[in-house]
Amino acid sequence: MDVRPKENFSQRQDTSAVRHRKTCKVNERAEIPSQPHNGTINGVNKRITKREGGEHISSPSRDAHVPVFILALVIVLSVSTRFYKITEPPHVCWDETHFGKMGSYYINRTFFFDVHPPLGKMLIGLAGYLTGYDGTFPFIKPGDKYEHHNYWGMRAFCAALGSCLPPFAFLVVLELSQSSTAALIAASLLIFDTGCITLSQYILLDPILMFFIMGSVLCMVKFNTQRLGPFSFSWWFWLLLTGLCLSGSLGVKFVGLFVILLVGINTALDLWRLLGDLSLSLVDFGKHLLARVFGLIMLPLFLYTTIFAIHFIVLNRSGPGDGFFSSAFQSRLIGNNLHNASMPEYLAYGSVITVKNLRIAGGYLHSHWHLYPEGVGAHQQQVTAYLHKDYNNLWLVKRLDNSDDLTGSPELVRHGDIIRLEHKETTRNLHSHFHEAPLTKKHLQVTGYGINGSGDVNDLWQVEVCGGRKGDPVKVLRSKVRFLHRATGCVLCSSGKTLPKWGWEQVEVTCSPYVKETPNSQWNIEDHINPKLPNISLAVLKPTFLEILWESHIVMIRGNSGLKPKDNEMNSKPWHWPINYQGLRFSGVNETEYRVYLLGNPVIWWLNLLSLALFVILLTVASLAVQRRVKMEGMMKVHCHTLMEGGGMLFLGWLLHYLPFYIMGRILYYHHYFPAMMFSSMLTGITLDILLQNLQLLFSSSLSHYLMRGGQSVLLLGFIYSFYLFHPLSYGMRGPLAHDSASSMAGLRWMESWEF
């Protein structure tokens, strides 16, 4: 099944800027150069050819016959496994409650907040819209019936992109190894993996992300094969398509940065190779450099920015995500109380206000009837920062002496004034004292204290307008204000830390002894109600596109790092993933419910793990052989290059998509491993194929041929049979759970941590 190109490099017409190069002889002992001519990471394997005067290493022809029948079979199997029972179960499963809802928001043009960039949700919403979904299903919780709503279009879109992964893997491995056997093994690992199937069948970001990651790798490999014809149409096509896929990867999730790094390393090595080519002028090298800067940096940045521009244009109506953003950001949203709003320009005594922290995603100053628990400072009313608009965000501005002059014109609050802030709902004053803050130990606790506005001297705060002078009035929305506590000298601050369950997971508010001006200690007056004052228009506050783009990224990054596990939810560990330690419940928990369980096919995953170890051993042996200039026969040279170049690129891709999770502080889930799993599967295809082909070193030619074909057949049949055993995990189960001996899955619970 191997595809070995027949055309010699020396027979090809080279019309590129690097034409007229000479093909160098290979030293009789040094059969493989220690530093391959085209770099360590690329998509072209060397081929050994015979010419007068010795052996040469040259690139395989790109005109070699592609095994169309095998590729067609891969496509058919991939599509059929992903679309089978696509409408079942007819209820919300796992994170469909998030991403289906967000697709609805796009259809309804309602603004929301999410920790991921918008492209994936935009495409889900577009798929739903084009297939007749009207955006009215609420997606409240897993298990809710879809009933008459057209949810299938969004699932089908995700399944279609998921169906592309095995064909992409086939083409990538075919380019890297020039072996259709290796390509078929790699594709089969993805076709028959129950985990990949499950992720592809629901309204999730994962199949969209993996589509763009695999597309980026395929386009990069294809671009590498165009080295003999730089600046040709196909050369530009694959370069620009690589940039397009990179922008798509990053536009779905920030995990796309890992494949950008992979392509960046490949590009850097490629440019280093060109720089060392003395037949290439510096002018031509500059053209190569500028072309890659345009195709792999400028184009992806432009497309990525365009994604956000469309996102902001479509989501122009106020929604549940408003409170995560600044007052200026909210003023552009139709339906928000700040959009085209008018309110009093200057703060006055007797005004009812909301106070928003200027730290991005800092929240509104908030209180409620709940008290700090015993052992956490004083047992008084909690004061927090809350990210959503709420009645408990309202505060009444009162004078130092607590008097209310209801007659005459209102008196403005000015820089240097000493005020009280009374919580509108509970009538307790904003208060601080010499008790330690709940989380930030060097800060002081902030509480609500007093009854009906009466309290003590610890309720007094001095207003300071940042950059202002004594007597300057406080401007609503535009003035940056700080509140200095008179009794302790500290400054009101939002620490950005999330309180435990007793604090309703809201943001900690403290009084900081560090009085230096920072966004954490700066606030602005957002809502302002005072019927005695004239109103002015706030339209001038709308921010520029670059300002909202920057703010969106800061909010996403902080939101992502702040994700914590829910109640009774296990935080998956990265070391769990390669060994398939534990899956995820997508639907159902008991024997009467329709159960779907995200778990990789254990035969495939454990084979991938074994192949990783085998690859490291083979790579070490090959590297030592090259370093010691060991003489090798023809096919051994090809296999050595395949391991070091094609295998090296895939191994690096696996490392880049797996190791960073060990240093992430956010909650992690099992499904985060699947991009790395794709690289592992492609590497398995190359590793096993090389092992099978090298059986000829141990056995006679005829016997090794039969053993190789037998090994290939055993592998493929093993994938199919293991898929047959575990397919209920993807397509649904009913009846007793696997720990019950009466269950049809009882004998398949090979690890106690599996919960199906």
Curated annotation (Swiss-Prot):
Tissues where the protein occurs: Widely expressed. Has particularly strong expression in ovary, testis, liver, brain, muscle, heart and eye.
Annotated InterPro entries: GlyclTrfase_39-like, Glyco_trans_39/83, MIR_dom_sf, MIR_motif, PMT_4TMC
Statement: the UniProt record of this protein carries the keyword Transmembrane: yes
Enzymatic reactions: a di-trans,poly-cis-dolichyl beta-D-mannosyl phosphate + L-seryl-[protein] = 3-O-(alpha-D-mannosyl)-L-seryl-[protein] + a di-trans,poly-cis-dolichyl phosphate + H(+); a di-trans,poly-cis-dolichyl beta-D-mannosyl phosphate + L-threonyl-[protein] = 3-O-(alpha-D-mannosyl)-L-threonyl-[protein] + a di-trans,poly-cis-dolichyl phosphate + H(+)
Pathway stated in the Swiss-Prot or TrEMBL entry: Protein modification; protein glycosylation
Main location: endoplasmic reticulum
UniProt keyword list: Endoplasmic reticulum, Glycosyltransferase, Membrane, Repeat, Transferase, Transmembrane, Transmembrane helix
A GO biological-process term: protein O-linked mannosylation
Compartments where located: Endoplasmic reticulum membrane
Protein's membrane topology: Multi-pass membrane protein
SMART domains with a match to the protein in the record: MIR
Disruption phenotype: Morpholino knockdown of the protein results in developmental delays at 18 hours post fertilization (hpf). At 48-72 hpf the tail is abnormally twisted, and pericardium formation and eye pigmentation are also abnormal. Swim bladders are incompletely formed. Glycosylation of alpha-dystroglycan (dag1) is severely reduced.
Spans through the membrane: 64-84, 110-130, 156-176, 179-199, 203-223, 245-265, 293-313, 602-622, 643-663, 672-692, 713-733
EC number, UniProt record: 2.4.1.109
Entry GO CC: endoplasmic reticulum; endoplasmic reticulum membrane
Residue span(s) of domain MIR: 344-400, 410-466, 471-528
Pfam families xrefs: MIR (PF02815), PMT (PF02366), PMT_4TMC (PF16192)
MF terms in GO: dolichyl-phosphate-mannose-protein mannosyltransferase activity
Enzyme superclass (EC): transferase
Purpose: Transfers mannosyl residues to the hydroxyl group of serine or threonine residues. Coexpression of both POMT1 and POMT2 is necessary for enzyme activity, expression of either POMT1 or POMT2 alone is insufficient.
Similarity field: Belongs to the glycosyltransferase 39 family.
Protein name, entry field: Protein O-mannosyl-transferase 2
Organism this protein belongs to: Danio rerio
